[in-house]
Amino acid sequence: MAYPIKYIENNLVFNHDGECFAYYELLPYNYSFLSPEQKYQVHDSFRQLIAQNRDGKIHALQISTESSIRAAQERSKQEVTGKLKDVACAKIDAQTEALISMIGENQVDYRFFIGFKLLVNEQEVTMKQFRREAKTAVSDFLHEVNHKLMGDFVSMSNEEIWRFQKMEKLLENKISRRFKVRRLNKDDFGYLIEHLYGQTGTAYEDYEYYLPKKRFQQETLVKYYDLIKPTRCLIEENQRYLKIEQEDGTVYAAYFTINSIVGELDFPSSEIFYYQQQQFTFPIDTSMNVEIVTNRKALSTVRNKKKELKDLDNHAWQNDSETSTNVVDALDSVNELESTLDQSKESMYKLSYVVRVTAPDLEELKRRCNEVKDFYDDLNVKLVRPFGDMLGLHGEFLPASKRYLNDYIQYVTSDFLAGLGFGATQMLGEPEGIYIGYSLDTGRNVYLKPALASQGVKGSVTNALAAAFVGSLGGGKSFSNNMIVYYSVLFGAQALIVDPKAERGRWKETLPEIAHEINIVNLTSEEQNRGLLDPYVIMENPKDSESLAIDILTFLTGISSRDGEKFPVLRKAIRAVTNSEERGLFKVIEELRAEGTTISTSIADHIESFTDYDFAHLLFSDGDVTQSISLEKQLNIIQVADLVLPDKETSFEEYTTMELLSVAMLIVISTFALDFIHTDRSVFKIVDLDEAWSFLQVAQGKTLSMKLVRAGRAMNAGVYFVTQNTDDLLDEKLKNNLGLKFAFRSTDINEIKKTLAFFGVDSEDENNQKRLRDLENGQCLISDLYGRVGVIQFHPIFEDLFHAFDTRPPVRKEVEE
């Protein structure tokens, strides 16, 4: 098969038959966890894209390109700011080396290219037009003669190029209404051709194709050598494979085509292009050469086939024998197809479908070929590997190429082509940023930029910086949350972690490289910490202090703002303290006693009954305590010793006094985070609320969480909620203000359904439920800024980070032995 490409101009490829194809990259769309309705929407868009071409040819390619891990990591380094820049860059470099040693310099990245044959507009026949056509024909003949004699240059008429460019603009406008596309350029074509001829190890984004042109007034010249340069290699054709030798290695390639489709490909579940990305651990390429058969021609072909089948039926009847079931079934299908074509006036499509499998040696090629055949077998598609036709099928992958074999044509409808899932993939996260792990379905690295949401990025479905980590105990919530906070701090963020279980107390020892920027505030019940959590001490603004004092005292005493007798008395006492010189919660008790009424004395006694608990004196001061908690370091951790948090199942009415005091302290600390949020707006900040459910269950906590989230959005701060159930976050206002979401393993079916609904995916779909139930430690469902949902494995890479963030109790050595 001769090399088909005659000339390349931007995204236009001219072949030697006078045809011109316009090629585009179909920017992949996320297909994972879509509901059937959403899948049908994509299907209809693609069907209309194909059906709008009433005539001509379409060439669709799924190509396994390579993307550079090192380049992504280097781009990530550009995102780093702040005091820990040197530490972060060293960490990213170590990450890069570890990733490259595990998976190599490049990762497989599937790209989708689609080419449409441009049809010349029918123009009125005029003398001027006739003369122009004659002139073009003569010049083409002369160029062909020159080319045959000299063979050095290819000449292309500028007028011809300009005419096709005008048509391509109209086509691009039509396509881009339905899908995001990018016009290809010479570098794309160069990479594609070199890839087909055995080139490996080059990252797609680093590749350059040198194709100089010389433009004259009437024509443009290009060296023929430059056009065929990407095909440089030694090809040895065998009956069942090609041996392609390049300077840096040898590749063996085998080609399959469809022999027959023996059953129905039911949509959704027939998306071959989508599922084969997940199925195979090795790269494969696929080509679809589609010739459009106009409706009239298709009807004529179908009716001729119908006559043949009827003849067979009559022949059997005349010979007193039964018509075979194959003929009867075929007649039914033909009748159905005829009525469909007649009613819809749609075209039919001649499909030549070729799959390319490559391997470094013959043994591996054989194994891969068997795997590909088995995969297609399961979908009722029988593949065949034609003897002696490998080079011809190889040629079908080249841009603007012709169909090589007519023996394996499948007549299909636009519905069938749309149901193959062309362009569907699983995309998660950002192209660069914090490396958090990899997608379990595609194996691709996943990067996040936690501060990006507020920038209003194109395509994002949220501008909320807040994030949620949900899941049952031991699934990896705290670990993954710690990892994201740690890397965010390295990348320049400032963090405040509320650590009620005191799990992060050893971070200065376990994270020595950033120990100088870690500040651990451990509030024990010692005398020197007395009153540090008093609302009047911890908050700078007196108004904020007053508001927090009301929240805490109503929470502890159970006095509702709707209580017409007690609430006004308490409110009056708090306001009096706010307006006085010496401010503290003990002063509120004094103010209530000074009131002298039965109600005020009763409230004073009630509040005072809390003050003699072990660590309650953290909450109460008499106005002589000064604020000494500093949050100036990059990573600040606040711990309160001896906190007793209620169980998740305990209702608010059943809280013990210790539990009430513990939750009250968490509310104070979390409100203190408001002051932290209102610092420098140019620095991204994180407020991390571990065990957030404990205060999200009470009214004061819910109000506070919304305050934090709203302030965070305005002041460039993300509030991270780490909690066990989505119920805690299902308040509509809060739910709509969450950006990134992570859900870890859950076994309770009701919780699973709620989590799936929280992620906006079909909660009744059994496959979705099974995926969430079967997650292993460190694996989670993620929803990114663009609303894309997938399953990832968190990957800390470094053992020291794993040990630092691991919250499991240590195993005794004797047990191990």
Language model regions located:
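Charge-patterned, long linear interaction tracts outside catalytic cores
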Residues: T126, L440-V446, A451-A453, K458-G471, ...
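P-loop NTPase motor core of the ASCE superfamily
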Residues: S101-M102, N541-K587, L729-E817
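Short glycine-/polar-rich loops that comprise or flank the Walker A/P-loop
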Residues: R54-K57, Y110, F491-A493, M715-A717, ...
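Extended, folded cores of ATP/NTP-driven motor/assembly subunits in large transport
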Residues: M1-Y411, F422
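P-loop NTPase motor domains
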Residues: P36-R54, T65, Q277-F280, V293-S300, ...
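Conserved P-loop NTPase motor cores
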Residues: D313-H315, A451-V485, V498-G505, V521-E526, ...
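Short, structured coil segments at secondary-structure junctions
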Residues: I514-H516, N737
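Post-Walker A helix-loop "phosphate-sensing" segment adjacent to the P-loop in P-loop NTPases
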Residues: Y486-L496, E509, A515
